[in-house]
């Protein structure tokens, strides 16, 4: 008997009600009782099973990116980059690969409004012939801190106060003044783009620096950029209040309704590349996740397009159980020494094992669509049917073999063990440059948001903390620092 043929699914439904084990249920409305008024009998197994299943419906919420929406579609290569990478799904223009994408807010809970000022997650899973590839990013090109050691504390500071369960400004300001590299990220978060209009009208970025390797073994650093063909649109404060007040799931609804109506969202994929031999030529560290690569000296190169043309069939199966991890790579794409990326490689998979179990990659939405083979087996919720006798390697009785060798970066490393910051700091220049590109009204809105944050009357936002933030923004842009100090009745200092 085929163990998969009769697996419970909507495609193999019974015409009548059953228990989980398949026994017929003749009454799904009434408990088994002594007489018509009770008490209820414990022997009513269907009642016990129904309640027990209900009690366990919820799984642990993602510690970040809890609120999200997913959609399916395809990625198509439009420009040849085979000279940069040997990744099979990027081998030639015209090649299409199925994808599933999850958009999300970052900090707030699963049921929170989608109009809050918060970064947005932008994660893409490619189902390729060489296995799955996860490109896990955000709608901003940079991050708050450049060392993953600080990530748990950063999330704690952004999350609600553990005593009151309220997100509070003083905690955010108190934590991040210790990390001036966060200024660049705040130039995005407190900008108009801090509240996207919806998921269709926002950029996506791989954020971290990765590595591309071609067939000859030549490697380059790479940054990934998704650009929506319908443009970037944002909600200002009054608009966010109005939209969020009428529908706290507006972005999820917009995504679903647009696809259902045939108005398919589309993004163009671009890359930037740097030869690792030239990484010391820049005034920033290319592996610093708090910095962007200036497009005037490192131009965008077109790669392909992504179209989302199918809604998910089940929210739990294809959104809540959908799991991403930057460690899931393919031949031709590799990690870099980006400190934040290095910690994400471990933390994401570890989080999914906690949330979904050790066999989370067997769930249909996470499983590869191509054949695979290894000796990772058993454990909680194992769903793979195996009938082989040999579960070790190597063996003369098993024909499975090693795959062909694939190129990986061959950088030679020699240094002392150290715990230290990235040597090239330069925390303020890019934040200031970004601010100066805006129109005056956009600058004024940015200033107003910072004045509001620093004017919070909580006594834990001390004069010292305000002074530090004014100093930081003064170093980014002198006029911005002066305006901020003036609104706060303070003296600007650098």
Swiss-Prot record:
Cofactor annotation: heme
Entry GO terms, CC: cytosol; peroxisomal matrix; plasma membrane
Record-annotated active site: 65, 138
Protein's UniProt keywords contain Metal-binding: yes
E.C. numbers: 1.11.1.6
Coiled coil: none
Enzyme class, spelled out: oxidoreductase
Binding site for heme: 348
Substrates-to-products reaction catalysed: 2 H2O2 = O2 + 2 H2O
Entry's Gene Ontology BP terms: hydrogen peroxide catabolic process; response to hydrogen peroxide
GO molecular function, one term: metal ion binding
Record CDD domains: catalase_clade_1
Signal peptide: none
InterPro entries named among the record's database cross-references: Catalase, Catalase_AS, Catalase_clade1/3, Catalase_core, Catalase_haem_BS, Catalase_immune_responsive, Catalase_sf
Job of this protein: Catalyzes the degradation of hydrogen peroxide (H(2)O(2)) generated by peroxisomal oxidases to water and oxygen, thereby protecting cells from the toxic effects of hydrogen peroxide.
Protein name: Catalase
Organism: Pisum sativum (Garden pea)
């Amino acid at each position: 008997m085929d163990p998969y043929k009769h697996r419970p699914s909507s495609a193999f439904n019974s015409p009548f009600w059953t228990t989980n084990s398949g026994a017929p249920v003749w009454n799904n409305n009434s408990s088994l009782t002594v007489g018509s008024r009770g008490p209820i009998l414990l022997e009513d197994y269907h009642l016990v099973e129904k309640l027990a299943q209900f009690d366990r419906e919820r799984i642990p919420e993602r510690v970040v990116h809890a609120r999200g929406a997913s959609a399916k579609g395809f990625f198509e290569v439009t420009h040849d980059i085979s000279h940069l990478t040997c990744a099979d799904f990027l081998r030639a223009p015209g090649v299409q690969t199925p994808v599933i994408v999850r958009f999300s807010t970052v900090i707030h809970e699963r049921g929170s409004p989608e109009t809050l000022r918060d970064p947005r997650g932008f994660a893409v899973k490619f189902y390729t012939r060489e296995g799955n590839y996860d490109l896990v990013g955000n709608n901003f090109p940079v991050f708050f801190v450049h060392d993953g050691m600080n990530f748990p504390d950063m999330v704690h500071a952004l999350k609600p106060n553990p005593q009151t369960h309220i997100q509070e400004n003083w905690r955010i300001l108190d934590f991040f003044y210790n990390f001036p590299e966060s200024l660049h990220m705040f130039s995005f978060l407190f900008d108009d783009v801090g509240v996207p209009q919806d998921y269709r009208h926002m950029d996506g970025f791989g954020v971290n620096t990765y590595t591309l390797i071609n067939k000859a073994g030549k490697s380059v650093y790479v940054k990934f950029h998704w650009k929506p063909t319908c443009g970037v649109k944002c909600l200002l404060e009054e608009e966010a209040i109005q939209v969020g007040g009428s529908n706290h799931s507006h972005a999820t609804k917009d995504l679903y309704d647009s696809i259902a109506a045939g108005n398919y969202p589309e993004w163009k994929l671009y890359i930037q590349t740097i030869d690792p031999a030239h990484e010391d030529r820049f005034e920033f560290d290319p592996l610093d996740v708090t910095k962007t690569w200036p497009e005037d000296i490192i131009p965008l190169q077109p790669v392909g397009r992504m179209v989302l043309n199918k809604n998910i069939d089940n929210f739990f199966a294809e959104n809540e159980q959908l799991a991403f991890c930057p460690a899931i790579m393919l031949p031709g794409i590799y990690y870099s020494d980006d400190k934040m990326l290095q910690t994400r490689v471990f933390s994401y998979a570890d989080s999914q094992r906690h949330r979904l179990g050790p066999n989370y990659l067997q769930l249909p939405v996470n499983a590869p669509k191509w054949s695979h083979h290894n000796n990772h087996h058993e454990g909680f919720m194992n769903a793979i049917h195996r009938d082989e006798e040999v579960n070790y390697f190597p063996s003369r009785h098993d024909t499975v073999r090693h795959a062909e060798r694939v190129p990986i970066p061959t950088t030679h490393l020699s240094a002392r063990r150290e715990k230290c910051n990235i040597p090239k700091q330069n925390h303020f220049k890019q934040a200031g440059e970004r601010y100066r590109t805006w129109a005056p009204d956009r600058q004024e809105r940015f200033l107003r948001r910072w004045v509001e944050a620093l004017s919070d009357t909580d006594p834990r936002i001390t004069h010292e903390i305000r002074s530090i933030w004014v100093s930081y923004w003064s170093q980014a842009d002198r006029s911005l620092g002066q305006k901020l100090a003036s609104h706060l009745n303070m003296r600007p200092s650098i």
